[in-house]
Amino acid sequence: MPTVNDTYINALLADAAYEKKLVDGLQGADLITALSPRLTPTLAKFVGDNFTVVSHVEGSHWSGSSFDGTIWRGKADTPYANKTYVSMRGTQELPDFVADLDLATNSAARAEIADMVNWWLRITTPVGQMATQIAL
């Protein structure tokens, strides 16, 4: 069962994932700077000191899917070492309302699910191999 601290860390990283300046490999002082517009200085420093952005993807907000996701990894010598967290952003742009309509009428936001699966397949495929991708 997750502890209150686990739940808090997940919520903090989920909030941090809404920052537009995230890129793969961001960590330390650069991550703190990127998070400063969204988080308080104390929280931005906490995230920058304890986590690295492993992968960040932002969907095309005009293609019908605006799936956005971030994978965080705890840094060595921190309480979060070797832990991986996945954060996905919710509805924020006009096309997301199209996805919400798809969800309401078809039981799934199909374009966003396809984008999420394709992103996961790309980042988990070994270097030098072709990643399997799905299409609607």
Question: Model-predicted segments: where are they?
Answer:
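N-terminal low-complexity, Ser/Thr- and acidic-residue-enriched intrinsically disordered segments
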Residues: 1-41
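A conserved cap/lid and substrate-binding interface adjacent to the catalytic center
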Residues: 38-135
